Amino acid sequence: MTLTLNRQLLTSRQILVAFSGGLDSTVLLHQLVQWRTENPGGALRAIHVHHGLSANADAWVTHCENVCQQWQVPLVVERVQLAQEGLGIEAQARQARYQAFARTLLPGEVLVTAQHLDDQCETFLLALKRGSGPAGLSAMAEVSEFAGTRLIRPLLARTRGELAQWALAHGLRWIEDESNQDDSYDRNFLRLRVVPLLQQRWPHFAETTARSAALCAEQESLLDELLADDLAHCQSPQGTLQIVPMLAMSDARRAAIIRRWLAGQNAPMPSRDALVRIWQEVALAREDASPCLRLGAFEIRRYQSQLWWIKSVTGQSENIVPWQTWLQPLELPAGQGSVQLNAGGDIRPPRADEAVSVRFKAPGLLHIVGRNGGRKLKKIWQELGVPPWLRDTTPLLFYGETLIAAAGGFVTQEGVAEGENGISFVWQRNA
């Protein structure tokens, strides 16, 4: 068996390979070492993710270090901790792995993983069990976008048996994860109990399943093409989804548009029930309502006849964050990012006797630059078109008890720079 590298892989000279130390990734790394020999300008690194789920996890790290040392491949070991609630162990481990991959990738590097034909078959069956449509039944693509670069699966057309033959023929050593024998996990149940039975009855079942997945991917790609104009018409420059153009659409067409909009936000693919709730409970909620549908760590909200996909954040209206060293950036609570004061702008610097702080609400009537008369903060937010969920999380700059400016919003008359070197109040949000 030889590894036929995807042509898109050959355009990249920098590769990061996911290396668990198991059979599949060991064969992949072995063949990529050969690729490096044939392409002297190519750079190859490996990453091993230590989940801490097995008593053997430290021994696996040692094994991977020894293999990479033997093959002269730089190895990055990422230790991750899984959350104690929310997703199941399988989903948590996968999420943690791919977050580690994204953190480790260097500019210009592509990620290469060792999924093979049997994995593709299992992925298809899992999607079928969940009741997925063409997008889910497309299973895994040989090349896909990931973390601003590409994720490539060059073994996707090869069976697990072929990889085992290669490993034995070349005297490779690999680890066996004992959890792979635990059929309480859905994927293991399919691998150990279901797929062997199907393969016994239909020897080419994995190949035909992969063909069906490819046809689903083709249909999904065609839908993307046919709906591109509709999506562009419904989507605003800010990335929100306008409700009015979708009112006259059929249910199926509207659901397809919402799915593609969410995919563009890197959101998890919603179930059919979730799509119905997005439309009925959020888009069509009473005009005076502020509807919100939680989907994991994110929310779908409606504002100004548009759907918004936002990260869930706890309101900060009661928080006061002192900023004693205001020449340095200030970390905000609840993962809201950071703020800093930069040279150049319309805001006056604080006087020596003024304590600087960041707050998230301001009482009384406020007089802001560009507006006549005083207004309450709620009215200012409405006039500026600030969505309700941002109104108690947007950082407000205070000198003493005086509101000076809102990040990205306004400057008060008490905070305007006059005949002096002004500064700007910049909010750097977390992704």
Swiss-Prot record:
It comes from Escherichia coli O157:H7. The keyword Ligase applies. ATP binds at residues 20-25. It is an enzyme of class 6 (ligase). The lineage of its organism: Bacteria, Pseudomonadati, Pseudomonadota, Gammaproteobacteria, Enterobacterales. Keywords: ATP-binding, Cytoplasm, Ligase, Nucleotide-binding, tRNA processing. PANTHER family: TRNA(ILE)-LYSIDINE SYNTHASE-RELATED. It holds the Pfam family TilS. One of its GO terms (cellular component) is cytoplasm. NCBIfam families: lysidine_TilS_C, lysidine_TilS_N, PRK10660.1. The keyword rRNA processing does not apply. Belongs to the tRNA(Ile)-lysidine synthase family. SUPFAM superfamilies: Adenine nucleotide alpha hydrolases-like, MesJ substrate recognition domain-like, PheT/TilS domain. Its EC number is 6.3.4.19. InterPro entries: Lysidine-tRNA-synth_C (IPR012796), Rossmann-like_a/b/a_fold (IPR014729), TilS/TtcA_N (IPR011063), tRNA_Ile_lys_synt (IPR012094), tRNA_Ile_lys_synt_N (IPR012795), tRNA_Ile_lys_synt_subst-bd (IPR015262). It catalyses: cytidine(34) in tRNA(Ile2) + L-lysine + ATP = lysidine(34) in tRNA(Ile2) + AMP + diphosphate + H(+). This is tRNA(Ile)-lysidine synthase. The N-terminal region contains the highly conserved SGGXDS motif, predicted to be a P-loop motif involved in ATP binding. Ligates lysine onto the cytidine present at position 34 of the AUA codon-specific tRNA(Ile) that contains the anticodon CAU, in an ATP-dependent manner. Cytidine is converted to lysidine, thus changing the amino acid specificity of the tRNA from methionine to isoleucine. It is found in: Cytoplasm. GO terms for biological process: tRNA modification. One of its GO terms (molecular function) is ATP binding.
